[in-house]
Design a protein with these regions (language model features):
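N-terminal cap/lid segment of alpha/beta-hydrolase-fold proteins
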Residues: 1-6
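Conserved HGGG/HGGXW glycine-rich cap/lid loop of the alpha/beta-hydrolase fold
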Residues: 7-59
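Structural signature of beta-strand start/N-cap positions in the alpha/beta core
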Residues: 17, 43, 84-86, 111-112, ...
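Active-site loop signature of alpha/beta-hydrolase-fold enzymes
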Residues: 26-27, 50-55, 121, 249, ...
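Active-site loop/oxyanion-hole signature of alpha/beta-hydrolase fold enzymes
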Residues: 36, 46-88, 92, 101-107, ...
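Flexible "cap/lid" loop of the alpha/beta hydrolase fold
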Residues: 109-164
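Conserved serine/cysteine hydrolase catalytic core
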Residues: 188-260, 269
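Catalytic histidine-centered segment of alpha/beta-hydrolase-like enzymes
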Residues: 273-286
Length: 298
């Protein structure tokens, strides 16, 4: 990578290149069940983001997470000499793709694009009501500020276990509040309370065990003010949107508006899913990825 760190990149299959950009907290191997059926026609190139999987020990750059991810992806594209390739972006991976559309001319290099459950603008304001958590966005930012305050006051701690008991409780309580905010599962509050009262379970609620990386990602979502609406609307290659009909993180209405702003796009709705259709509707998710790829070979 540009800072001489080595990013882990999983490469599976043979054939035309498909670059796959994961969501926050995912590891590259999680994609394998959904891509397995297409492995004879396509080579899937799946980087692990810094802080996760095979890239968990990469140094944290000075820049924000999305800019850093785009730099890493752009470097990978150049190293592998990718051109007219298929791109799949899910959640934070889709944000990284849109960053490339706006700042790196990425759209001109694509044969097709699959955009999975992400908004083109994280903040909510008068011009865009469909950012992260919609009308609950102010509460979301308040919870992230609580997390930031705990982590900033304990920069000497590198792992969750390094925190004092009171700091651990504050961190888990704030993170649990965020999870409850986005959850439609009636069992979730009980699970959060159980974890809060059981130190052994607390760390398993956290998406990242390295606290310096957690702070980096939290500050990214607190400060990210990019607006990618115009950039993604200019994408001309065949584009498919996977949209969770019940997505609380990124309201379906906003995603539909963006899908309709493209000249060559269609939307696939996951009726029983929110932000994680690969978990709630894995069979449909796998089938629709297969259809998307098959359409590009015709």
């Amino acid at each position: 990578m540009p800072d001489q760190e080595k990013l882990f990149v999983r490469r599976v299959g043979e054939g035309k290149p498909v670059l796959v950009l994961s969501g926050l907290g995912m590891q590259s191997w999680l994609w394998l069940p959904f891509l397995f059926a297409s492995r004879k026609k396509y080579e899937f190139i799946i980087p692990d983001w810094r802080g996760f999987g095979g890239s968990k020990d990469c140094a944290i750059p000075e820049m924000d997470a999305i800019s850093s991810h785009w730099n890493d992806v752009n470097t990978l594209i150049k190293q592998l000499k990718l051109d007219q390739f298929i791109l799949i972006g899910y959640s934070m991976g889709a944000t990284t793709a849109m960053h490339g559309f706006k700042h790196g001319g990425l759209a001109q290099k694509l044969k097709a694009y699959l955009h999975i459950d992400q908004t083109p603008k994280i903040p909510v304001d008068d011009s865009w009501q469909y950012g992260l958590l919609g009308q609950k966005h102010p509460l979301f930012k308040s919870l992230l500020l609580d997390i930031q305050n705990v982590l900033s006051a304990n920069r000497q701690a590198t792992q969750f276990e390094d925190l004092a008991t009171s700091a651990r409780d504050q961190l888990v309580k704030a993170w649990g509040g965020f999870l409850e905010l986005q959850s439609s599962n009636s069992y979730s509050p009980k699970l959060f309370k159980a974890a809060l009262n059981c130190p052994f379970l607390q760390k398993y609620l956290m998406p990242i065990q390295r606290l310096d990386y957690l702070l980096w990602y939290v500050e990214n979502y607190l400060n990210h003010d990019e607006d990618y609406r115009e950039a993604i609307s200019q994408v001309n290659c065949p584009t498919t949107f996977f949209i969770g009909r019940s997505s609380t993180l990124y309201p379906e209405t906003g995603q539909t508006i963006i899908a309709q702003s493209l000249s060559n796009a269609k939307a696939v709705y996951f009726e029983r899913s929110g932000h994680t259709p690969l978990i709630t509707q894995p069979r449909k998710f796998s089938q629709e990825i297969g259809k998307f790829l098959e359409n590009q070979s015709q």
